[in-house]
Amino acid sequence: MITVTREQKNGVASIKIAGTIDEHVDLQKEIGPLPAQVNVICREISQINSLGVKAWIDFFSQAAHHQIEFTFSDCPPPIVEQLNYITNFSCGGHVVSVSVPFTCENCHKELRGTVKSEDLKKVFYKLPPIKCPKCSAKALFDDVPEEYFAFLIRQGA
């Protein structure tokens, strides 16, 4: 089940999707018609299964076919995983930013931070540590950069 929140600013729609995308989700019904430009905020997507992937590709492929320009922002690990596994998962949309996992070296708190795709290229996909809000120690990126950002590296983003 998902929840969708829509907002319009300067002619660009923002659509925030939260929850699990699976066989029970009808993206056309949940999201509805799209304007000419849309930013899809993915941060709160918690899971996507194989039938959810099919629904996603069907929906965004149709949007691309109708000349709708769309971007994806705050892509969380479940979406990043699909972007890495399925070449056309973005259906021609541009990934603006990625939500990345960090783990504190001291207290082992799991954190997420958002990084712009263009900034990742500037640092060669190597993220500096961030400060843990719980204990102030260093939190390190908790994955292999070449694997987690493979879809961006392939695109040259």
Which sequence ranges carry the predicted segments?
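Cys/His-clustered metal-coordination modules, chiefly Zn-binding fingers
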Residues: N84-A157
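Amphipathic alpha-helical interaction surfaces in cytosolic regulatory modules
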Residues: V12-V95
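Short beta-strand/loop segment at the start of cytosolic alpha/beta domains
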Residues: M1-S14
